[in-house]
């Protein structure tokens, strides 16, 4: 699982990537778009997980800043989407890679007071947005990599391949660097 694209991640040896069958990118951060060709050279299936309500408007200038995903979320939840991909970029990537679902609003449903109806509503909006955006939806990753029994039940009914906290953060291969943040797995 990859969030931020740091120089340390870009300099990891090919042998690290050989350990993965699939490379997954959470949140559709703009830096992931800028560097997708770097990861394509490892010849792995790649899935970019999209929260359909966190997309940069086409008329906004994007930031190439490497930003912790939690901080990017805070900015997005306050209306600033400059650290995320635009729909046109997501659609471009969909020609070569899979775009998976990551919820509509990127809500943390684990251990929450949210009802099954709220989970269903958020997921149904995500599904309808994928159709509206002409994107195939075959995979799903829980926001913050945290599942919830109701969430799992509903997503399974949609026949989506489910990804969660079983994924290994690529950052775990660079623990001794200043960019390592163990909390990244929760973005």
Predicted regions and their residues:
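C-terminal active-site subregion of NodB/CE4 polysaccharide deacetylases
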Residues: 1-24, 29-30, 34, 116-139, ...
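Metal-dependent polysaccharide deacetylase catalytic core of the NodB/CE4 family, i.e.
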Residues: 2-4, 20, 40-147
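Aromatic-lined substrate-binding rim segments of carbohydrate-active enzymes
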Residues: 31, 36-43
